[in-house]
Amino acid sequence: IGAGLAMASKIRKTDEVTVFTIGDGGTSHGEFYAGLNYASAFKAPLVGVIQNNQYAISTPTSVQTGAETFAQKAVAFGAPFVQVDGNDFLAVYVAVKEAIDRARKGEGPSLVEAYTYRMGPHTTSDDPSIYRTKEEEQSWDHKDPILRFKAYLINKGFWSEEEDKALIEAVNKEINETFRKVESYGANVDLIEIFEHTYQEMTPQLKEQYETHKAFLKGSE
């Protein structure tokens, strides 16, 4: 889709640049390579950003690719690439901006790999302790991009601990007030609406899910 949108911009002669993001696991899909090859061959204004958080659900990068980096996969398409610290806000900004500027000048696609780490589970059904250690997770604690950028802004005099505290309090207040407001509306939607809005007629699987969930809610009353 990204390559197609970028090509449409080129055909229409606009200055639009398409930026797509993909996980490290997503690069194992064939359309990733097909799209980049197409964009490179026709110099489409496309920028790919790979979020390499080192795990595709539970699959480590070591068994996803034989390449040293994901960024270097761009070599096969004759496109420039760069790997940056994905937890460094400014590094990511500069790398993506340079890629966008290059695409806007008609020089074709670029690939940016943001090397980072997924701190939590992939989903609520995922248990990271099965495939990685607590020590590994803790080694990334101090690399939190929000805390790092906050420290940078404070050191440069653009921000302060007082402003940060006030901002957090204001945001938490807004979240709590919004939650209470929504909660006050009550359950005004029938349960079945969650399952019947996608298809004209519910599929057998959706009907089964609906009945299962209805029974679960009834049992928890």
Give the ranges of each region predicted by the language model.
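Glycine-rich ThDP/TPP pyrophosphate-binding loop and its adjacent helix/strand module
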Residues: I1-S184
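Hydrophobic alpha-helical membrane-spanning segments
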Residues: G186-V189
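Intrinsic disorder at enzyme termini
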Residues: L191-E221
